[in-house]
């Protein structure tokens, strides 16, 4: 079993950090987006350009993700799908999605969408900071190490 790293790359601020972790651990990496993005020219990193549209990149990732795989995404519904498939998911700010918290994250997202549809102003996420980048690197490295240890030899 070859573990894989999937990056939900549209608007992902930590692609370069993810590339470094993937290279260090020898993870096959798919960078999935709906437009061309420059990726390092290495055999372990492959760019996948999907059609434009809602959830097209998410669907591509979810259909291929399985146990031992790690997904970088800020998309809560995709993280839920990844967890259900046996994979692990981490947000660019270092937040690791878990079975224990994904239900409340989905509910909060749904409430926010409902309020916005009614014209309510809701605050957006905090600005991305260097501390987020550091938390992400630590979380991704830990997830990859954990997945590698769990993989059959």
Curated annotation (Swiss-Prot):
It holds the Pfam family DUF188. It comes from the Bacteria. Disulfide bonds: none annotated. Belongs to the UPF0178 family. This is UPF0178 protein CCNA_01273.
């Amino acid at each position: 079993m070859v573990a894989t790293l999937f990056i939900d790359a549209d608007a992902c601020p930590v692609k370069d950090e993810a590339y470094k972790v993937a290279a260090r651990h020898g993870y096959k990496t798919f960078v999935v987006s709906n437009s061309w993005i420059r990726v390092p020219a290495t055999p372990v990193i492959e760019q996948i350009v999907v059609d434009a549209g809602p959830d097209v990149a998410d669907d591509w990732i979810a259909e291929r993700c399985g146990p031992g795989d790690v997904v970088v995404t800020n998309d809560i519904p995709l993280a839920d799908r990844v967890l259900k498939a046996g994979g692990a998911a981490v947000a660019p700010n270092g937040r690791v999605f878990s079975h224990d918290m994904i239900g409340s994250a989905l509910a909060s997202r749904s409430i926010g969408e409902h309020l916005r549809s009614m014209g309510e102003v809701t605050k957006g996420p905090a600005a991305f900071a260097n501390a987020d980048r550091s938390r992400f690197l630590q979380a991704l490295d830990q997830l990859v190490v954990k997945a590698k240890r769990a993989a059959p030899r």
